[in-house]
Design a protein with these regions (language model features):
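N-terminal pre-domain/capping segments
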Residues: 2-140, 158-168, 175
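Acidic/histidine-rich catalytic cores of soluble enzymes
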Residues: 73-74, 164-201
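Conserved beta-strand edge residues that scaffold enzyme active sites
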Residues: 79-80, 111-113, 145, 152-153, ...
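Active-site groove signature of glycoside hydrolases
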Residues: 138-156, 177, 182-186
Length: 201
């Protein structure tokens, strides 16, 4: 186990631009080893082109993470299996494969379910409810979170108010299932840290 001093030396070496090639491959690419310097996960988006063109099957994601990269934690993209969540059979197969490989499912990245900060009350409610199935799927797969977008329209303060409303309602549903709701700081005002902090307040 590294001491605090060892950790600071390694961090300083990396931060100062010293080559990290001396670090083992498992330190960089993830490992189940308790001695690894870093623990990382593989985002399914890394394979989205291969999956979309049929080169890689979504169900092979956990196997690829473990066998090709020695990574034992993964993050799913809802778009890559959105048409298969109608029943529990597919999710059960996903879970069985990940469990069999010793891979932990961490979260589901969610897009194309509507704007959680939509100015229209009905559309905003629909967007919130569209995310429920992903909270349910995340719970079933053993994830700790889903990642969402805080998309909205209008003036700065109005978007903050609308996004806060949608996220608050979705967070309430997530809390009932012990699933966190994480906002991606990507696109629109969600890239503004001050704005996003205001949404959370």
């Amino acid at each position: 186990m590294d001491t605090r001093r060892d950790f600071l030396k390694k961090t300083a070496a990396i931060a100062s631009g010293v080559s990290i090639m001396g670090l083992s491959g498992t330190s960089l690419y993830g490992s189940s080893s308790k001695d690894s310097l870093f623990k990382i996960s593989l985002a399914e988006w890394s394979l989205n082109k291969s999956m979309r063109n049929g080169e890689v099957d979504h169900l092979d994601f956990a196997k690829i993470a473990k066998k090709n990269f020695d990574i034992d934690a993964i993050e799913y993209v809802n778009q890559l299996f959105a048409d298969k969540t109608g029943g529990s059979t597919y999710l059960k197969e996903m879970k069985n494969i990940a469990d069999g490989e010793g891979v932990k499912s961490l979260l589901i990245m969610c897009d194309r379910e509507g704007a959680l900060g939509d100015p229209d009350d009905v559309a905003r409610t629909t967007a919130v409810e569209n995310h429920y199935k992903w909270v349910d799927a995340a719970k079933y797969l053993g994830c700790h979170s889903i990642r969402v977008n805080a998309q909205s329209e209008g003036e700065y303060d109005e978007q903050m108010k609308l996004a806060a409303d949608g996220l608050d309602r979705l967070t309430e549903y997530g809390a009932k299932h012990d699933i966190n709701i994480i906002v991606e700081n990507h696109g629109g005002l969600s890239s503004n840290g001050k704005w996003l902090s205001g949404v959370m307040d």
